[in-house]
């Protein structure tokens, strides 16, 4: 190298600092590609925020629905608890506050109602295409209790048996759940 060029370099050393790269400092990308990348990142962030808001709204709606269902099933005027039988899921038992217990037996198409004092048990057949609601059944059974003049027959007498001599084996046609509910009290078929 020439001595003169060394002096020039010593007096004015070359600038080894990095070239200005803009605001975000994305190296090795042309400016059009940088803009496109920024736009894509912004769009992805907006989509993530929108999806998050929708999922949060769905979660809140589900919690609200569960809370309304829980409040309607556990209300103070008619406390209703549903317990499905584990085996085949063929019976549903409802405790209606302090008024009594209703059992739907879907396999045998029977509905049993035992009032709270537990003095008797009412049994009726149900049609599979027209299953009465719990509210309609409660009204029907309560109206039935108010009117003692309605002629009813004991289940054993209607079947041609003597009701007083009915053994526990004679109640097998009612099923386990209904037999457990109504086994110790007189049965009336409606």
Curated annotation (Swiss-Prot):
Start and end of every BRICHOS domain?
94-190
Propeptide residues are: 1-23, 59-190
Q: What is this protein called?
A: Surfactant protein C
Q: Which GO terms describe its molecular function?
A: identical protein binding
Keywords in alphabetical order, please: Disulfide bond, Gaseous exchange, Lipoprotein, Palmitate, Secreted, Surface film
Q: State if Secreted is listed as a keyword.
A: yes
Q: Where is the lipid attached (S-palmitoyl cysteine)?
A: 28
Localization per Swiss-Prot or TrEMBL: Secreted, Extracellular space, Surface film
One Gene Ontology BP term is: respiratory gaseous exchange by respiratory system
* Keyword Translocase appears in the UniProt entry: no
Summarizing the function annotation, the protein's role is: Pulmonary surfactant associated proteins promote alveolar stability by lowering the surface tension at the air-liquid interface in the peripheral air spaces.
SMART domains, alphabetized: BRICHOS (SM01039), SF_P (SM00019)
GO annotations of cellular component type: alveolar lamellar body; extracellular space
The cysteines joined by S-S bonds are 121-182
* Any further remark recorded for this protein: Pulmonary surfactant consists of 90% lipid and 10% protein. There are 4 surfactant-associated proteins: 2 collagenous, carbohydrate-binding glycoproteins (SP-A and SP-D) and 2 small hydrophobic proteins (SP-B and SP-C).
Main site of residence?
Answer: secreted
Question: By its UniProt entry, which Pfam families does this protein fall under?
Answer: BRICHOS, SP_C-Propep
């Amino acid at each position: 190298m020439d001595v003169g060029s060394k002096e020039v370099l010593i007096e004015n050393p070359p600038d080894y600092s990095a070239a200005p790269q803009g605001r975000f400092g994305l190296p090795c990308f042309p400016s059009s590609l940088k803009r496109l990348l920024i736009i894509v990142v912004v769009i992805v962030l907006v989509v993530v925020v929108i999806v998050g808001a929708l999922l949060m709204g769905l979660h809140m709606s589900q919690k609200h629905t569960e809370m309304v269902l829980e409040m309607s099933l556990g209300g103070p005027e008619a406390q209703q608890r549903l317990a499905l039988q584990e085996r085949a899921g063929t019976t549903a038992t409802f405790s209606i506050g302090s008024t009594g217990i209703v059992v739907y037996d879907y396999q045998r198409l029977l509905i049993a109602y035992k009032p709270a004092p537990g003095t008797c048990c009412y049994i009726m057949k149900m049609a599979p295409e027209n299953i009465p609601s719990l509210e309609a059944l409660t009204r029907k059974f309560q109206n039935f209790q108010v009117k003692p003049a309605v002629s009813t027959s004991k289940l054993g007498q209607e079947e041609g048996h003597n009701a007083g001599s009915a053994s526990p084996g004679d109640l097998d046609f009612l099923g386990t759940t209904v037999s457990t509910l109504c086994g110790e009290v007189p049965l009336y078929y409606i």
